[in-house]
Amino acid sequence: MKAVIDTNVMLVSINPGSRFNPIFRQAISGGYNLCISNSILLEYEEVFKFRINMNMAEDAIAAMIYSPFTLRFDPRISWRLITADPDDDKLSDCAIAAGADFLVSNDRHFDVLKKTDFPKVKVIPAEEFLEMIISKVK
């Protein structure tokens, strides 16, 4: 299973005390393939370093980069699907380039993808993805 994880979802999941932590743990341990691009990775890094402990941020980024289960993509096409927040296009573009099964986000800006026939991107909330990966582990 391949997934692109929205920055805010990844941010809450890297905290070991968060109930969403399995999203991060399963990404680096092979529960699913985390799909990232350089622009997503840079956004993760920027947000993490601003919002959490610097060491935790650096460790999380390194874990994602060096995990053999992380798949890196360099989207060649910008589909410009997220008109409400064009900065979020990097996530949908990566999901399309990766052929990801899911784009995981609680952000309403991605609702437009539910109405887009092509290219198709399945957006699911963090809670649903969490339940999916937890049930897969059991």
Predicted regions, residues:
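Hydrophobic/aromatic ligand-binding patch that stacks against planar heteroaromatic rings
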Residues: 26, 94, 115
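Active-site neighborhoods of divalent-metal-dependent phosphate/nucleic-acid chemistry enzymes
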Residues: 69-103, 108, 112
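Metal-dependent nucleic-acid phosphoesterase active-site entry motif
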Residues: 1-18
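A secondary-structure boundary/capping signal
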Residues: 6-7, 36-37, 106, 125-126
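Acidic, PIN/NYN-like endoribonuclease modules and their adjacent C-terminal/linker elements
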Residues: 89, 108-138
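Conserved beta-strand segments of alpha/beta enzyme cores
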Residues: 33, 69-71, 122
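PIN/NYN-family metal-dependent endoribonuclease catalytic core
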Residues: 5, 20-49
